[in-house]
Amino acid sequence: MCGSPNTTVGNGTRALILVGGYGTRLRPLTLSTPKPLVEFANKPILLHQLEALVDAGCRQVILAVSYRAEQMEKELKVEADKLGVELIFSHETEPLGTAGPLALAKSILSASPEPFFVLNSDVICDFPFKQLVQFHRNHGKEGTIVVTKVEEPSKYGVVLYDEDGCIKNFIEKPQEFVSNKINAGIYIFNPSVLERIEVKPTSIEKEVFPAMAEQQELYAMDLTGFWMDIGQPKDFLTGMCLYLSSLRQKQSPKLYTGPGVVGNVLVDPTATIGEGCRIGPNVTIGPDVIIEDGVCIKRATILKGAIVRSHSWLDSCIVGWRSTVGRWVRIEGITVLGEDVIVKDELYVNGGQVLPHKSIAASVPEPQIIM
C-alpha cells in the first residue's frame, strides 16, 4: 500500500457502516431489496461507500446489520472480492441505535490501535476519508465528525465548534439561526471511544458525542463538495442530481452523450434508447432498460430491466426493477414504482407510491400509496 501515513489509512484501519434498519423511508423499493443494495446512479448505495473506503486504503469493513443480512452477504461478497476488501457482518439481534453496533463489534475495532471510520449507510458525497485521517491525526483527540453546510439548519441538529474544529455544543433543530453546519454521518474514532459505549440501544449523537465534546475530545472537519442523506425518494433524486453534477465537474467519461441527451445523464451500456427521445437533465438509466421512441425523461432513475413505452413523459420519479410504463403515460411528483409494476397506457400518475407487482389501470392524480 502506498501513500504517506498522514494521507492513507494504515493496514490495521477498518471501517464500520451502520446498515441497520428496515429502509421504510425508501419504500416501495425496499420491499424488494435491502436499502444498501438499491442502485444509486447505477451502483448499489453501499458500493459507493465501499469503493471510497478501499480507495483510501481500508481493507476491512464491518457491516452492522439487523435485517435481510443473508441477501446482503450473498450480493456484496462478489463486489468485495473484486475490490479486495474483507467484509465482516455484525448481526444485531435487536436494533442497537447508532452507538450500540460499535460496542457489538468491539473485539474487531479494538484489535488495532489505528483509528477506525464509522458511517451511516444513507450518506452520499465526495467521501473525504484521506483528508479525515490527516485532520484527525493532526488534532490528536479521540474523535472527529464530518460536518456539512445545509440551507435549512432548523430541520437538523447543528454543530457549534471553534476555528480549530473543537466542538463546543450540539443544538437540536434550532428555531433561531446559530449555525448551518450539521453532522454529515461520517466519523473517525480512536479505539478508546469504545470504552464509552455498551452493547445496548444507544444514540451516538445524543449520548456519546456531548460527553466527548465536554471533555474537548471531539472535533469537526468541514466537508467540501456535495452531500445528501438519500434515505427517502425526494432526497434520493436530489442526491442523484448532485452526484451527476459532481461527475460533470470532474469531467467524468461515465456521463452519456448520445442523441437527444440534455445535461447530466448516466446510461448503462446494455440499455436501449429509441428515436426522437429527450433524456435529461439528471437521469440515470440502468442495465437492460428499454426506452421506446419519443419518450421524455428528466430528474428520474430508471432501474434495471424497466421498459418505458413510446411517447411517455417522466419527471421526478423512480421506476423500479422490471416495471413497465405504458404508451402516452405522464408520471411526476416524486412517484416511485416498486418492482414489476405495470402502468397501463395513457394514464397520469402524480406522487404515487406503487407497491411491487401491481398493475395500474386508472390515473392517480393525487399522491397516495397504491397497494
From Swiss-Prot:
Residues 14-233 are annotated as: Substrate-binding domain. Coordinates binding with substrate and required for enzymatic activity. Keywords: GTP-binding, Magnesium, Metal-binding, Nucleotide-binding, Nucleotidyltransferase, Transferase. Its EC number is 2.7.7.13. GDP-alpha-D-mannose binds at D122, D229. Pathway: Nucleotide-sugar biosynthesis; GDP-alpha-D-mannose biosynthesis; GDP-alpha-D-mannose from alpha-D-mannose 1-phosphate (GTP route): step 1/1. Residues 256-371 are annotated as: Hexapeptide repeat domain. PANTHER family: SUGAR-1-PHOSPHATE GUANYL TRANSFERASE (PTHR22572). Belongs to the transferase hexapeptide repeat family. This is Mannose-1-phosphate guanylyltransferase catalytic subunit beta. It comes from Drosophila pseudoobscura pseudoobscura.
